[in-house]
Amino acid sequence: MDAKIAIKDLRKGFRSLPVVGGIDLDVAPGEFVAIVGPSGCGKSTLMKLLAGFEQPDSGHVAIDGVPVRRPSPNAIVISQQGSVFPWLTVRENLMFGLLDGDPAARAATADHYAEMVGLKGFEKAYPQELSGGMLKRVEIARALAVKPDIVLMDEPFSALDALTALKMRNELLRVLREENHTVLLITHDVEEAIYLADRVVVLSTRPATIRTVFPIAQPHPRKVSQPALQEIKDAILAQLGVLEA
């Protein structure tokens, strides 16, 4: 099967500082891949390269065999900063990226995705009336409403409290089961990566290269406390320098 995302010898630096030091990775259609690495290793720069916000010094990122030169509606980014428009209602936020169809059809699509993420009844609410977890649901729904092939997530739950973040992970898995997206998640949370992903990619210190790729074979729902997953967690933490190997 051809790769949905193909990353070939990807390199990027700023002035004299090399940040991404040569990354090769293929992501299959419908696969969920998580990337973890030490703080400051170049994870966010890698995400910008994948999304087309930055161009590499050498190598390339390709989607369906086509090099990424600019941001694309087929690859939507959900970031830690949040991007909900405070002057728009939930429904209007979800309609924002919908270009096809008359207003009634776009509103129906927005309401469908609001219901999918558990926001039925809040379509007319403004962001200031919502909790942090509900705002993240709006972001996820808006990303999925434009029907992207690829969802790129840059530490999307890092600003949430631990209980809300755990709930949002479960919500994300539930929603992704309903639609077949290719997902690439960058996170500092090793348990989150193991809980969600089909594979976990561990990056080196800057300039980032791939140290190891860990396949996660256990089906969902998962418990990270399972011995097999705990063993993977310990191995990842050892590579990140948190535990002794």
Label the predicted regions.
Residues 126-130, 134:
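Conserved ABC ATPase signature
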